[in-house]
Curated annotation (Swiss-Prot):
Example of a GO cellular component annotation carried by this entry: cytosol
InterPro entries, alphabetized: Ribosomal_bS20 (IPR002583), Ribosomal_bS20_sf (IPR036510)
Similarity comment text for this entry: Belongs to the bacterial ribosomal protein bS20 family.
Gene3D superfamilies the record matches: Ribosomal protein S20
Species assigned in the record: Methylibium petroleiphilum (strain ATCC BAA-1232 / LMG 22953 / PM1)
Known role: Binds directly to 16S ribosomal RNA.
GO molecular function: small ribosomal subunit rRNA binding; structural constituent of ribosome
The protein's name in its UniProt record: Small ribosomal subunit protein bS20
């Protein structure tokens, strides 16, 4: 997403300043993880679109690890992670039919 051009007020309280420093670091980490998640999903969908069941299965295995790690870190709710895995799995199973 685009960065905000709004000028933010500086915080006076020490704990607030620390919170701002932490937010910058955590925001960067979350953005990176979210990007890794999207890339993993796209890889599986691309493999499904080509119709290659073997490649789709391999990419799904690696995507599962990424999805689970993101759910464990609390970036997404565990139910959302389960929903993504379920839908991707259904698409791969549909290739066999």
């Amino acid at each position: 997403m685009a960065t905000s051009s709004k000028v933010k007020k500086s915080v006076r309280i020490a704990s607030g300043r620390k919170r701002v420093r932490q937010d910058v670091r955590l925001n960067a980490a979350n953005t990176s993880l979210r990007s890794k998640f999207r890339t993993a999903i796209k890889g599986v969908l691309k493999a499904v679109a080509t119709g290659d069941k073997a490649k789709a299965g391999e990419t799904f295995k690696s995507a599962q690890k990424v999805i689970d790690s993101i759910a464990d870190k609390g970036l997404f709710h565990k139910n959302k992670a389960a929903r993504y895995k379920s839908r991707l799995s259904a698409k791969i199973k549909a290739l066999a039919a």
